[in-house]
Every structure is written in C-alpha cells, then in structure tokens.
C-alpha cells in the first residue's frame, strides 16, 4: 500500500542545501561517520522545493540500527528557522553515505511526525566525491505488505531536479570558471561586484555582436536563414520592454547605487563579525 505521497510530484532542490550539507560534513566530529539533518522547504501539492536544512546532533550505535537524536537541539533550530523563514516547513531529513542506512526506519518514523503530511523525504548525499561527482538521491518511504499481515517499509527513488535563481547562478558560474582554469590550485579572492558586472556586460556585448553578425549575414544572403533561430530571436526581442536611453540610465544608476549600498553594509557586517570573533577568542585575565 502506498502512503499519501504523490510520486508524480515534482521535487526541486536548491544548490544552497548541498553546500550546507557539504560544509557540515567537512566540519563533522572525527568519530562521526555521517551527518544527519532536517530538510526544510515549501510544498504546494504539485511541486516540492527543498530550500534549506540544518544538521541535527546525534549519536550512532554501530552494532545496531539504533540512533539517538538531540531532539532539544532539533526543536530549537526549527523554532529559530521559523522566526526567520516562517514559510518553510519540515519536508524530511538528509544524511550522508553511499546507501540508505539501517537507522533510516527510525528516522522515517520520527520525521513522519514532524512533517505536516506525514510523509517525509530522505535525501542521501555521497559527500566522498567519488569520481569527482557529488551523488545525490532522493527517497520516499513506501509501505509494503498484505492486509492484516506483516508490513514493511521500502525506500523508493524519487526524481530530483536542481534549480537556482539568478543570484545563485552567478555564484555557480564563478566557481565553475575557477574550477575549469588550468593550473588553479586554490580558489582566489572573489572579484568585486562591479568587476563582475563589467565582465557580464562584456560577455553580453559579445553575444549581441554574434547575433548581429548572423542577422547581417542572412540579410546579405551569405547564410541560409533558420526558422527556429528567427522565432527565438523574435521571442527574445518581444519579451524585452522598450525603454528609452534616459530612463535606462536612471534605472541602471539606481541599481548601481543599491548594489554599492549592499556592498558597504555587507563589508561592515563582515568586519564586525571578525572583530567579535577575535574578542571572543581572547583569553580572560
């Protein structure tokens, strides 16, 4: 018998969740073989979006499937998250490893009570980066058995999609660019925001030059026209609102001022955190 989870529902995972899991895995205690945490996100019935997560302290028992969770810590973290992101709800749990662990049944039982629909998702992440790839698999529990007889639980794979917004795509492209550079041994300092804007503008200019060259070649009968390309160009041009030069300059300058203000505030906060960290680390006399 299937639980009340729609296997046809679309599940979307945001990259920030994977970075949080990897960061927690790298900071795990030396005696810990895996990390476990709570998945948070939104669901509208047709699409489930995993947007956030936090690690839950636990103690493993290698000789059995028993696992002890710090429920007080988990509840406190959930309450703090609800204060900041009240729209996020518990969707399930994540763990690291190559396969579903023996403690998954107990974790499924716990998160079944925490989820509003009673059917948690299980995200399994292989953080060992075997083959230079991060393996991610998503499961949901499916009850199996005969009516009136013994029942069991089977974890069935669920299709998982990756999605990111424009801001995350900028960061992902930057990391990909750094990773693809030959001879790059370590990640360098991230370029200032204005430099990134200049680089993005230069790349946009190159693409516009390519489009104009194609159009001119078609008009000069140097290249055979392609209906698919023509429709794509038409859809792109009609989707861009017509803005005169003066209004565009005002909009661009306003966005630049907002960005400079955000840079200033983030720099001040970063400096304050660094000072607080140093003061906290100073020995008491």
Swiss-Prot record:
Keyword Cytoplasm (UniProt): yes
Subunit field text: Component of the eukaryotic translation initiation factor 3 (eIF-3) complex. The eIF-3 complex interacts with pix.
Sequence similarity: Belongs to the eIF-3 subunit F family.
GO BP term, pick one: formation of cytoplasmic translation initiation complex
Coiled-coil features, chain-numbered ranges: none
Record Pfam families: JAB, MitMem_reg
Protein name (Swiss-Prot/TrEMBL): Eukaryotic translation initiation factor 3 subunit F-2
Residues of the MPN domain: 11-145
Subcellular location as annotated: Cytoplasm
GO cellular component: eukaryotic 43S preinitiation complex; eukaryotic 48S preinitiation complex; eukaryotic translation initiation factor 3 complex, eIF3m
Keywords: Cytoplasm, Initiation factor, Protein biosynthesis
GO function terms (MF aspect): metallopeptidase activity; translation initiation factor activity; translation initiation factor binding
Function comment: Component of the eukaryotic translation initiation factor 3 (eIF-3) complex, which is involved in protein synthesis of a specialized repertoire of mRNAs and, together with other initiation factors, stimulates binding of mRNA and methionyl-tRNAi to the 40S ribosome. The eIF-3 complex specifically targets and initiates translation of a subset of mRNAs involved in cell proliferation.
